[in-house]
């Protein structure tokens, strides 16, 4: 009889290690919640908590005081519910597909109603059940993505019976440019939201996303729902990629801590001669004798092919450029600058960490941190830790 594959063996067999700091996540939530109080602060944990594991991340936010959790799909909410205590509330941002209303009500999950059709479907269920059903009502104030249009809102207000069947907990909208403080679209959306609320007196409201929590008190209303800021990304800095030096020297204005590190294992080190080609298509040609190392992660693990010949890893303070094309399961590094024998089979190199932030990797990929974060695959060994005062306590 064979022995079971232990957790230690699984971790050693993985191509890389993704370490998630639950203490930093709690800090980021508390920092935002404290700054915008008495506005309630929710946590957006859609897409498996931005790829970091909602079943571990959401309870960390709960421990920090969060009681409101937003996901995108009903299935996400149902899967997460067992990991939260009964006084937590789950909201479904995308609303409900036909035929799922009864399940949503049965589970005690609140839908965000984004169209008159969704409102009508939810009200019809309330009529069948003989009771008002709670929900959030979203308005489109300028993003043209989700929410009732102005015409739908007018029709809704005319239908007193329809409104009477729903217990509207919040009227919400979403900022399209909240991460750009100087963008005039923010003020326009705020004005539209304020005008809508004037027609729904005393109804609690929510507008601010991560960026919105840094725009000032007029954007806070009664509930804010930060997402990316909770996961260690300053929303005002994430697009500042035009000048790498300026980006690296720009000091964060907000007490947001990084929450993850990513390292990858070396699977081979070799010496190559001048003229040797590296990777698919031979896009890199050695300009002299050099030492290269192959690591066991690739674009299947969220390290996009656009990193080919321009990204990097780190070993200590030494930058190790990516050479050749990124493959599905492997990446090749120029490690000539390291003393011979420094790297060997199983050695770990840093991909995201103190020497290279998530934003830096996103910049090298010509994308945004959200895309990298949510693309980090399930092949990594995931380690959840609490880092306190320089000490580390491993939880999984």
From Swiss-Prot:
GO cellular component assignments: cytosol
Active-site residues, record numbering mapped to chain: 46 (proton acceptor), 280 (proton acceptor)
CDD domains linked: PLPDE_III_AR
Catalytic activity field: L-alanine = D-alanine
Primary enzyme class: isomerase
Record-listed N6-(pyridoxal phosphate)lysine modification sites: 46
Leader peptide range in chain numbering: none
Protein residues bound to substrate: 145, 328
Cofactor field: pyridoxal 5'-phosphate
Pathway given in the UniProt record: Amino-acid biosynthesis; D-alanine biosynthesis; D-alanine from L-alanine: step 1/1
EC number assigned by the record: 5.1.1.1
Function in brief: Catalyzes the interconversion of L-alanine and D-alanine. May also act on other amino acids.
NCBIfam families the record matches: alr (TIGR00492)
Alphabetical list of HAMAP family matching this protein: Ala_racemase
The protein's name in its UniProt record: Alanine racemase
Gene name for this UniProt entry: alr
């Amino acid at each position: 009889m064979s022995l079971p594959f232990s957790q230690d063996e699984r971790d050693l067999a993985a191509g890389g290690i993704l370490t998630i700091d639950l203490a930093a996540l709690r800090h980021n939530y508390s920092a935002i919640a404290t700054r915008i109080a008495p506005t309630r602060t929710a946590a957006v944990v859609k897409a498996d908590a931005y790829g970091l594991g909602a079943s571990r991340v959401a309870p960390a936010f709960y421990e920090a005081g969060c009681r409101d959790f937003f996901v995108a799909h009903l299935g996400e909410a149902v899967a997460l519910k067992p990991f939260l205590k009964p006084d937590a509330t789950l909201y479904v941002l995308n609303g409900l597909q036909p035929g799922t209303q009864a399940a949503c009500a049965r589970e005690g999950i609140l839908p965000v109603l984004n169209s008159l059709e969704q409102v009508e479907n939810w009200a019809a269920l309330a009529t069948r059940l003989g009771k008002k059903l709670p929900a959030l009502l979203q308005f489109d104030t300028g993003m043209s993505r989700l929410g009732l249009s102005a015409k739908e809102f007018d029709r809704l207000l005319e239908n007193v019976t329809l409104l009477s069947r729903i217990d509207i907990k919040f009227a919400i909208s979403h900022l399209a440019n909240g991460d750009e403080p100087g963008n005039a679209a923010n003020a326009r959306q705020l004005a539209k939201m304020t005008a809508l609320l004037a027609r729904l007196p005393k109804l609690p409201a929510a507008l601010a996303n991560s960026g919105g929590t840094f725009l000032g008190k007029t954007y806070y209303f009664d509930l804010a729902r930060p997402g990316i800021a909770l996961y260690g990304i300053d929303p005002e800095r994430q697009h500042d990629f035009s000048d790498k030096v300026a980006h690296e020297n720009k000091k964060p204005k907000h007490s947001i801590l990084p929450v993850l590190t990513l390292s990858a294992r070396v699977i081979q080190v070799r010496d190559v001669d001048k003229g040797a080609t590296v990777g698919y298509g031979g896009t890199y040609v050695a300009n002299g004798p050099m030492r290269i190392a192959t690591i066991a992660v690739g674009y299947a693990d969220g390290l996009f092919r656009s990193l080919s010949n321009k990204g990097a890893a780190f070993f200590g303070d030494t930058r190790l450029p990516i050479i050749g094309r990124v493959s599905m399961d492997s990446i090749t590094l120029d490690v000539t600058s390291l003393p011979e024998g420094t790297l060997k089979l199983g050695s770990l190199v840093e991909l995201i960490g103190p020497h290279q932030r998530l934003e830096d990797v996103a910049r090298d990929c010509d994308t945004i941190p959200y895309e990298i974060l949510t693309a980090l695959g399930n092949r990594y060994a995931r380690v959840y830790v609490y880092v306190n005062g320089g000490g580390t306590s491993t939880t999984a």
